[in-house]
Regions:
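Hydrophobic core positions of alpha-helical segments in small-molecule transporters
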Residues: 16, 43, 74, 100, ...
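Transmembrane alpha-helices of multi-pass small-molecule transport proteins
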Residues: 10, 14, 32-80, 107-108, ...
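Hydrophobic transmembrane alpha-helices of multi-pass small-molecule transport proteins
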Residues: 73, 103, 117-136
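Membrane-interface interhelical linkers
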Residues: 1-17, 49-73, 114-120, 139-143, ...
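A helix-boundary/kink motif common to multi-pass secondary transporters
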Residues: 36-37, 93, 173-174
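Helix-helix packing/entry segments at the starts of transmembrane helices
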Residues: 43, 97-100, 164-181
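Glycine-/small-residue-enriched transmembrane alpha-helix faces in small-molecule transporters
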Residues: 1-39, 76, 80-84, 127, ...
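Specific alpha-helical transmembrane segments that line the substrate/conduction pathway
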Residues: 39-50, 78, 86-116, 154
């Protein structure tokens, strides 16, 4: 049985993914003051899950215990990444929060680097993130430590999300793992 996602050209899926992530993030950020970070994340993930379940129609049976543990960990990392990031926004300017959050995936990239050129690319990415953010114009003493801790946690969950996304992709065909997460 083919899913709706199987019949859509890949570039269109990528474009739809980009639009949905950006729109969902913007909408969720505007909801944070009204329903809190937790409520915003729950609504965002429930909506995304419903769409994925409809369009991907994943198989629920026939997966190993290891596959289920992987997809559950992936979903938890995704939820906690979003929750800690949105929570950090109550304490930090968005540019600073994003800059701190990027420490997670950049640290992962640095840890997985095998060549000096990889390390140069990680350093260039880190410099670029800092330069386009508000991080350099915001004195460290003015930053709330709670916000810093939450943004660092969001970065750690982002790194875990990256690792678990790869493992989930190895355990489930196509988008099934993401839909089940």
């Amino acid at each position: 049985m083919t899913s709706a996602a199987d019949r859509v050209p890949a570039p269109l899926l990528v474009l739809a993914g980009i639009v949905s992530v950006q729109f969902g993030g913007a909408l969720a950020a505007t909801l944070v003051p009204v329903i809190g970070a937790g409520g915003s994340v729950v609504l965002r993930l429930l909506f995304a899950s419903a769409l994925l379940l409809v369009f991907v129609r994943p198989r629920w049976r026939g997966h190993s215990r290891r596959a289920w543990l992987t997809v559950i960990a992936f979903g938890v990392a995704l939820g906690l990444m979003n929750f800690t990031f949105y929570s950090s926004l109550a304490h930090l300017p968005i540019g600073v929060a994003v800059t701190i959050e990027f420490i997670g995936p950049l640290s992962l990239a640095a840890a997985l680097s095998r060549r000096w050129l990889d390390a140069v690319a990680v350093a260039a990415a880190a410099a670029g993130v800092v330069l386009i953010s508000e991080a350099l114009s915001t004195p460290f003493a003015d930053l709330e430590k709670t916000g810093i801790a939450l943004a660092l946690l969001a970065g750690a969950f982002w790194a875990a999300y990256i690792v678990l996304a790869g493992r989930t992709g190895g355990e489930f065909p196509k988008l099934e793992g993401l839909a089940l997460a």
